Amino acid sequence: MNYIMCRNNLSQSSLPQLSSSAVNDANIDYFSLKPKLSLDTNSSGNSEIIYSDCDNNKNNNDDDDDDDDYNKDTYDELLDPFDTIAVNQHDLEYYSPLTPFEIQNTSPQDSIISSKSSNKSNSLQPFPLTLPNLTNYRFLIVDDNIINLKILNRVLLKLYPRSNIVQVQDSKLVNEILQRQHFDSVFLDIEMPDITGIDIAKFIRSDERFNQMAVIAVTTRNSAKDLQQYKECGIDHTFHKPLNYSLDLIGGSIDDIIERRKSL
């Protein structure tokens, strides 16, 4: 069972599957629905998770308090249910953004990191983050793997504590979602069943309404040939899995891409 999941900084929310009736509802808002989040991935071993909303008890009109408390809010949000999930996929090597590794200071475009390489450092140090970006960005993450969705969601929440994030496992739903919601950036896995990240990127770039939408690939496929193909189909940037880059580098790259797209 595939779920659409949404995180809103002011009201915790999630999205159920798009049924035929929901698809026909032109007024659907993916940031306003409020059922609980589920991590059901057709596995009896995965339990149902419900998020708590650390922002519900705050005065939404007090921006100064929000600014002062963003560290606390971010910390609370990063206590992610992913930490309690037993990962049974023995070949999955995609590390938590909060797990310290040797920090990569080069561009993700120029530095391809093997998931089988020695990423773990003996002298562990956490990823640094100079200052979170408090812009209310809207992000869409598309990945058929629930664990990968959760990890990228955690990275983005640490970089952008006030962002609104929709997570989608079923790539066939992306077309309908893009017709109904605006996003500042879409993060795509490349290898997905039925509709790939390449297919989604081509669809986005074929519609001039989405010219200001950044498209970022997050994938293990980062050969020179792959990167050239991504560029040709309109993908703005590529991050390699696992995301063991400094948070400042990831955030700076995303900010630059969004700014460049909005200037078109």
UniProtKB/Swiss-Prot annotation:
Q: Where is the Response regulatory domain?
A: 138-256
Disordered, as annotated region: 50-74
Span-the-membrane segments of this chain are none
Looking up SUPFAM superfamilies in the UniProt record yields: CheY-like
Question: Which residues are modified to 4-aspartylphosphate?
Answer: 189
Keywords, alphabetical: Phosphoprotein
Q: Where is the composition biased (Acidic residues)?
A: 62-74
Q: What job does this protein perform?
A: Required for stress adaptation, morphogenesis and virulence.
- The protein, known as: Stress response regulator protein 1
